[in-house]
Regions:
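Single conserved hydrophobic/aromatic residue that forms the stacking wall/gate
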Residues: 1-7, 11-12
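His/Asp/Glu-rich mid-to-C-terminal helical/loop segments that flank catalytic regions of hydrolases
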Residues: 94-95, 126, 130-151
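Conserved alpha/beta core surface patches that mediate binding of polyanionic ligands
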Residues: 52, 76-122
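Short His/Asp/Glu-rich catalytic/ion-coordination signatures at enzyme active sites or charged loops
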Residues: 21, 119-130
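TRNA-binding/sensing appendages of the translation machinery
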Residues: 13-67
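Metal-assisted phosphate- and nucleotidyl-transfer catalytic regions
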Residues: 61-67, 140-205
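Short, glycine-/Ser/Thr-/acidic-enriched flexible segments
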Residues: 26, 84-87, 104-106, 126-129, ...
């Protein structure tokens, strides 16, 4: 394992990717990532979910077409996927409880952690569920991932400067819930301009 590389500029790292992967920091992050993925799989499988994959080449957008990656496809247009949602909704009547861990591609500049050209994410679909059921699953998944990391990767987390007490709070705390109406009223009380029915973007969250 390499402890470091001379120069950390992006171009140097990209030109020496095979060496960068051997650095202590990168190796640590890959181990943590592996534990996160394993926790997601175990969470859903323990609850009788079926893992379901969808194509990465799709015919259209799911969440808006402004950031789609267009790909030439044998004389036709195709796009890199942003979500497995449409395929999952088609399969849900047959499988009822399904999930995936998959890549998502967006043709946008990677300016912040919220703007990534490619990222991996987990999605789930479940039949015969309401909003509270979905939130229950989401909260339980976060707790399960946090507990898994505390059990499997405490040293790695600390080596990256992560506070284990913060992660313990994610593992053990209750998550407050508020209705959309209340969220709008709270924002208005703080002087935020918002009308009922508008989405809550990152700044409002």
């Amino acid at each position: 394992m390499l402890l470091g590389l001379v120069g950390s500029e992006m171009c140097i790292r990209d030109s020496n990717r095979h060496l960068y992967l051997r650095t202590g920091r990168m190796t640590t992050m890959l181990k943590i990532r592996s534990s996160v993925f394993g926790a997601i799989h175990s969470f859903f499988r323990d609850r009788d979910f079926i893992e379901y994959q969808a194509p990465n080449f799709v015919a259209g957008a799911v969440e808006g077409g402004s950031t789609l990656f267009e790909v030439p496809y044998f004389g036709r247009k195709a796009y890199l996927t942003q979500s497995w949602q449409l395929y999952a909704e088609a399969a849900m009547p047959a499988l009822e409880r399904l999930y995936t861990i998959a890549p998502s591609f967006r043709a946008e500049k990677s300016r912040t952690r919220r703007h990534l050209t490619e990222f991996w994410h987990a999605e789930m679909e479940i039949a015969w569920a309401d909003n509270n059921d979905v939130m229950d699953y989401g909260e339980a998944l976060v707790r399960h991932i946090a507990r898994t990391l505390l059990n499997e990767r405490p040293a790695e987390l600390e080596s990256l400067g992560r506070d284990l007490e913060v992660i313990r709070r994610f593992a053990d705390s209750d998550y407050p819930r508020i209705r959309y109406d209340e969220a709008v009223e709270r924002l208005k009380s703080k002087g935020v301009e918002i009308e009922w029915g508008q989405d809550l973007d990152y700044s409002k969250e």
